[in-house]
């Protein structure tokens, strides 16, 4: 999963495994969907995110002009926003819904992401949704310098 630090917009998918290749594919998919520039990928120190220049996720970050930052080792609270979203996913989606099969699980995840981004008020955003925050941001007038 990925979350925008500014708007709390959520991107998530069900990956086949925790490998660098799956993480790189998810990043590429997120970049394709995201309407704004991603400056940094902030992650834990897992082997799926960190490695040499030949590492698939490192290469994907570089190809998309995305820098990498990492949490302090054994300190998941340094990535508190992501940890909170994971808890919300587990509380509001995963533990509440009985999935018929893998396809249904994926459909239900997409529905939850839509709900999370467009309907669910966020206390950290003064009860706005990520969609409302992004809409307000992109609707700002562009000022020209004289």
Whereabouts are the PLM-identified features?
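Short, acidic, Ser/Thr-enriched surface-loop or helix-capping motifs
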Residues: 4-5
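Short small-residue beta-strand/loop micro-motif enriched in glycine and branched aliphatics
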Residues: 9-13, 69-71, 95-96
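Active-site beta-loop-alpha junctions of metal-dependent nucleic acid enzymes
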Residues: 12-36
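Acidic/histidine-rich, metal-coordinating catalytic segments
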Residues: 18, 36-52, 74, 126-131
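Residues at alpha-helix caps and immediate loop-helix transition turns in enzyme cores, especially N-
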Residues: 23, 53-54, 81
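RNase H-like polynucleotidyl transferase catalytic core
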Residues: 42-46, 61-81, 98-102
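Short, aromatic/basic amphipathic alpha-helical patches
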Residues: 52-61
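C-terminal domain-tail junction helix/linker
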Residues: 64-66, 88-146
């Amino acid at each position: 999963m990925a979350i925008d630090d500014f708007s709390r917009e959520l991107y998530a998918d069900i990956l086949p495994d925790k490998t660098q290749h799956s993480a790189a594919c998810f990043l590429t998919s997120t970049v394709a969907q995201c309407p704004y520039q991603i400056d940094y990928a902030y992650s834990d120190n897992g082997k799926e995110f960190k490695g040499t220049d030949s590492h698939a996720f490192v290469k994907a970050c570089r190809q998309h002009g995305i820098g990498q930052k990492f949490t302090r080792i054994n300190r998941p609270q340094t990535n508190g926003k992501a940890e909170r979203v994971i808890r919300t996913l587990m509380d509001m989606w995963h533990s509440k819904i009985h999935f018929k099969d893998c396809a249904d699980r994926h459909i239900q995840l997409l529905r939850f992401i839509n709900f999370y981004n467009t309907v669910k008020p966020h206390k950290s955003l003064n009860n706005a949704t990520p969609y409302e925050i992004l809409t307000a941001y992109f609707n700002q007038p562009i000022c020209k310098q004289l």
